[in-house]
């Protein structure tokens, strides 16, 4: 269901089957008008889509003649990845943040939803467009950048090759021609001044921190009770008592900071730190190898 077909018709039909699956999974019901209103299709087309879904997963739904709707059966089993809980909850978050409009989302009934708010980053569309084109065309840029290590802005010639998100802000991953190093530059702190076509192109494959991945292994805090450890393992989706997070080496500190584990210390209060880093010595070595991690990204 997730892969698109060879034509627009096939892709559209797959999307409508996904819609049916999601609505049955979470709303427990669907009717023709749901499909007709969301996709702007005819009643015969909606009936055909519901009929096809019945052919694919007949045990998932039953028609209630009194209510004139299809109801999910107790034996319902989703047939598409769109019905996964994580994707559904992410969609609720996007709706709550206003990233998507209700008429663009497969979510039917939307419960009252609250999300942690973050400052709105002042990033200009023109700056992002310029960075994207520089990455695509392998062109260097002269920028004015305000580092947190310097009292005043400085000008640098950068060759950006990727974008990264640390959970709060977006960064441009770029080669700094003056310092001869790959670094992260917060997009909201830079102003593009001009293109520098004379700068020597830099191969992004040389950025070992970006191209190499590392694995952080998390385990329950040793001070938790057996019952607490079990619920933490379930909450984090642990297998055999631990879960593994793979990330780019250059994103390692961001990942740890996002989990409030950047110090790698084990708290004396397990209730405040549910998990600890199992391979802390490995992580320390990776952090030492990455200059940005060693400096704790103070820029």
From Swiss-Prot:
MF (Gene Ontology): DNA binding
Region listing for WCX domain, in residue ranges: 197-299
Outcome (variant: residue 235 to A): No change in promoter DNA affinity
Annotated stretches, region: Winged HTH domain: 1-84
Induction annotation: Represses its own transcription.
A family per Pfam: WYL
Region (WYL domain) location: 85-196
Effect recorded for residue 183 to A: No change in promoter DNA affinity
PROSITE patterns, sorted: WYL
UniProt xrefs under InterPro entries: CapW-like (IPR016634), CBASS_pafABC_assoc_protein (IPR051534), WYL_dom (IPR026881)
Disulfide cross-links: none
Keyword annotations: Antiviral defense, DNA-binding, Repressor, Transcription, Transcription regulation
Domain of life of the native organism: Bacteria
Region named Probable ligand-binding region: 145-189
Effect of residue 32 to A: No longer binds cognate promoter DNA
Entry's Gene Ontology BP terms: defense response to virus
Location of the WYL domain: 120-200
Function: Transcriptional regulator of a CBASS antivirus system. CBASS (cyclic oligonucleotide-based antiphage signaling system) provides immunity against bacteriophage. The CD-NTase protein synthesizes cyclic nucleotides in response to infection; these serve as specific second messenger signals. The signals activate a diverse range of effectors, leading to bacterial cell death and thus abortive phage infection. A type III CBASS system, part of a CapW-Cap6-Cap8-Cap7-CdnC-NucC locus.
Subunit (UniProt): Homodimer.
PANTHER family from the UniProt entry: PROTEIN PAFB, PTHR34580
Domain comment as written in the entry: Has an N-terminal winged HTH domain, a central WYL domain and a C-terminal WCX domain; the WYL domain of each subunit reaches into the other subunit to form swapped domains.
Name assigned to this protein: DNA-binding transcriptional repressor CapW
Species: Stenotrophomonas maltophilia (Pseudomonas maltophilia)
Lineage, opening ranks: Bacteria, Pseudomonadati, Pseudomonadota, Gammaproteobacteria, Lysobacterales
Gene designation: capW
